[in-house]
């Protein structure tokens, strides 16, 4: 029998934030750590997860586990960019994602860059609007990627040919 870890391709794991959080109890404060992690295969699959534990490595491990359970598939054009422009919104965080021509690279800030690189997107333009909270920005980016549609899917939904959609 093949172990799941061996069968799966090597995953890209990026820690976006680590925070120390406190629970106030009768005797004082109980501290623990919260980690936000992005996991992807570099070929169009990406997921995010949060983990919390009393030790940082344990919080990261839990976050990675959680991220692997919340993977989504991103439609890519030529395996390098997204099919169309989209605005991802989560809370007060907004992320504008635009397809880019070959050789442009990933033009993105911290949390957005982590998600896009883990997904394997090589050419894209982004602008982070609204809140700069890393958690909201990561979720807004994921929401934008989740909302992407391929031309074939749109054509099928509308009962038209791809040429009719593109022109």
Curated annotation (Swiss-Prot):
Annotated Pfam families: Ribosomal_S5 (PF00333), Ribosomal_S5_C (PF03719)
Keywords tagged on the record: Ribonucleoprotein, Ribosomal protein, RNA-binding, rRNA-binding
Domain S5 DRBM: 11-74
Gene Ontology MF terms in the entry: rRNA binding; structural constituent of ribosome
GO cellular component: small ribosomal subunit
Domain-level remarks: The N-terminal domain interacts with the head of the 30S subunit; the C-terminal domain interacts with the body and contacts protein S4. The interaction surface between S4 and S5 is involved in control of translational fidelity.
Functional description taken from the UniProt entry: With S4 and S12 plays an important role in translational accuracy. Located at the back of the 30S subunit body where it stabilizes the conformation of the head with respect to the body.
Assembly and oligomerization: Part of the 30S ribosomal subunit. Contacts proteins S4 and S8.
Protein name as catalogued: Small ribosomal subunit protein uS5
Species per Swiss-Prot/TrEMBL record: Syntrophomonas wolfei subsp. wolfei (strain DSM 2245B / Goettingen)
Chain's gene name: rpsE
């Amino acid at each position: 029998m093949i172990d799941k870890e061996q069968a799966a391709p090597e995953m890209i794991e990026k820690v976006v934030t680590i925070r120390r959080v406190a629970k106030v109890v009768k005797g004082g404060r109980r501290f623990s750590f919260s980690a936000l992690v992005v996991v992807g295969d570099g070929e169009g699959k990406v997921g995010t997860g949060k983990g919390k534990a009393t030790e940082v490595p344990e919080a990261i491990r839990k976050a990675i586990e959680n991220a692997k359970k919340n993977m989504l598939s991103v439609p890519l054009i030529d395996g390098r960019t997204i099919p169309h422009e989209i605005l991802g919104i989560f809370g007060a965080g907004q992320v504008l994602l635009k397809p880019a021509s070959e050789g442009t690279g990933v033009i993105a800030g911290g949390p957005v860059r982590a998600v896009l690189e883990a997904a394997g997107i090589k050419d894209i333009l982004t602008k982070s609007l609204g809140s700069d909270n890393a958690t909201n920005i990561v979720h807004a980016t994921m929401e934008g990627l989740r909302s992407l549609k391929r031309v074939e899917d749109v054509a099928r939904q509308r009962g038209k040919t791809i040429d009719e959609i593109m022109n």
